[in-house]
Every structure is written in C-alpha cells, then in structure tokens.
Amino acid sequence: MDQFDLEKHFAEVNAALGIKKRSDSDESYVIDLCDEVLGELALRQHTFDFLRGDPSESCLSGKKLPVDAYYPNKNIVVEYREKQHTESVAFFDRRSTVSGVGRGEQRRIYDQRRRDILPQYGIKLIEISYSSFNYDSKKKIIRNRQRDILVVKRLLLK
C-alpha cells in the first residue's frame, strides 16, 4: 500500500466509524497519551525495510507494513488494537487480499508477523487494546483523559 492508498484506506475506515478526521480516532488519542507518557513524539505509520507484507505482482518483495507508532529513542513500537483486530467486522473483512485470504485473516497474519519480527530487531512491541479502556457499545473509548493516562502508563511502563 503506497501513501495515497494508505490515506484512502484510513479515510474509508474513519468514515465507517463515523470519524471525521484521523486525528479524532481512538488510535490517535491513545498514541497521543503514549507520546505524553514516554516523553517523545511517535513516528506514526512508520515503516521498516525488514517488516513486509506478502508479495504481489506489483511488489515482489512485499510492501512495507506500517506500525501505528514508533519511538526510536526508546526502540518501542505501539500498536493500537481496535475491535477489527479481535473480531469479524464486515466493513473491514469484505475485501480479498493479494495473499488470497480475507482481510480479517490477513490482519491476523500481519499482526503476528509484527510480534515475531520486531523483537528480532531489538524493538519492543506493546499492543494496547480498546478493551483496556472503558468503551461504549460500538467499542469506542469513552474518553476520560485522567483515567486513560493511568491505563497507558500501566501498559507502557511494565
């Protein structure tokens, strides 16, 4: 996925979730909290040469897989896990992929790839799930900054 495709994908995802701008998303909110706790601004949607998706006709080596947030001074990657990472969501899972599997299955494969590969390069992966916070019936975070920063501190500093 090139930068244009990535932005288009995020726009579709955000529209499906009723989010006007990416900066309004739960992912952005949680990463903002991580920035504060870690005292560093994350490189958002960062890619590494060694972390790649499955090969396709247009990219035989596989496209670089983005991570939600990378903190180079701490060598930490934070991945925010929305509900589509743990359950089937028709909007997200409707497309087939270059790998010949559904999007939900590909997401599981790529999530596991991050878990396997990042530590091999000395990068600590921290996964933060929406379920760590108070959330509504749509599994969106019910935001309470004071409470939420404590959740993020507990997860990042363990």
Regions from the language model: what does each represent?
Residues 1-158:
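Nucleic-acid endo/exonuclease domains
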